[in-house]
Structures are given as structure tokens and as C-alpha cells.
């Protein structure tokens, strides 16, 4: 009985450590064995058009900063499409967005349909060849969109993941823990990219060729499905 409990404990420990220790270690071994996956960053082509999409529910505390951020990006790239889906917010999110209605494609849902539904709808509404999906509380760097062009200049690239930087990691232990976890997650994603085996995108910011995207089932996370 003691032996069985010990074996079960070891198995549980291995399962816990696998995502953080053995899985990254296996990726490093694969990378050493066959080298990095081919990554072509061709000369930047500005022929690709870009749309930025995000869903919002009760985001009144950040929505104005988000819009200032995106309109700044449009100032740098005048043809940037901006699409927003409001998922029946019960705060002032929709009211704060309405003044921007003539500058963006805005859909305000009268009922809760969920983020996946909203992202699917915005992807259908978008006209650009590259669609960037992001979150309402994520601010995009001024160079975020221009950095996409060298990757998508390679026709074999269908999706590009963003790099998330926590700006409030010093505010609390929870924020610091989240930032530490995300740094580990990003390290793993880099190893997956190096070995040509990225499992999922980052929901905070990722870009995909619109013609390659397929509707995401309602019960599946969009960044995992992609």
C-alpha cells in the first residue's frame, strides 16, 4: 500500500513538473539534435493590409486607453482596420465606444454571446489580409504592427504570436507571479517555434492570415484552436 502511494505521488509530481521542466527540456534536446526551424524574415513588404480585432465586456476602466492606443497605431498606418465587439456589457463600455463609431467597425451585442462568437464575427467583418486578435486590456507597442511585415513576407508563415510584457509586475505578489509564469510560457513558445511545433497562440496578441482562419467552435478557446 505504501509503495502504491509512493508511486502515485511520484507520478503526480512528474505530471506537475512536465509542463515546466521535462517538456521544455525535451524541446531543447530536439533543437540541439536537428537545429532551429527555418525562419525566413524577408525584406519587409507593406502590401499586406492589417486589421486589429478585440472583444470587450465591462472594460470601462481601460477602453479609452485601448482606443487611444489603436488610433495612435492608425496614425502610423492610416489604412489600419479597427474592429470591436461589445458582449452586452453592463457598465459604460459601449457608451465610451460609441463616439468612435465613425472611425471603427463597432458591433454592440444586446445579449451575452461570448468572446469566441465575437472573434468569429469580427473575423468575418474584417477586410484586411492579416487579422490581429488582441485583448481590451493589452496595449500594443508602436512597432507591433510593422514588426509583422517581415514575417508575413514569407508565404509559408500563417500565424505570428505576440510577445507580452507585464507593466504592473511590481504592484503585487499576484502580478509578479503572473509575470514570472508568462516569462516561462514565452520561453516555451520560443522553443516550440525553434522546433516548428507551436501548440497554441497567445490570446493577448496574435496575427493570422485571414484566408487561413476557420470559425472557432463556441466551446474552444480561439488561441488554442488557431
Task: Show the residue positions of the predicted features.
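Short, acidic, metal-binding catalytic loop of nucleotide-sugar glycosyltransferases
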Residues: 68-79
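Conserved donor nucleotide-binding strand/loop of the catalytic core
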Residues: 80-83, 94-125, 176-178, 182, ...
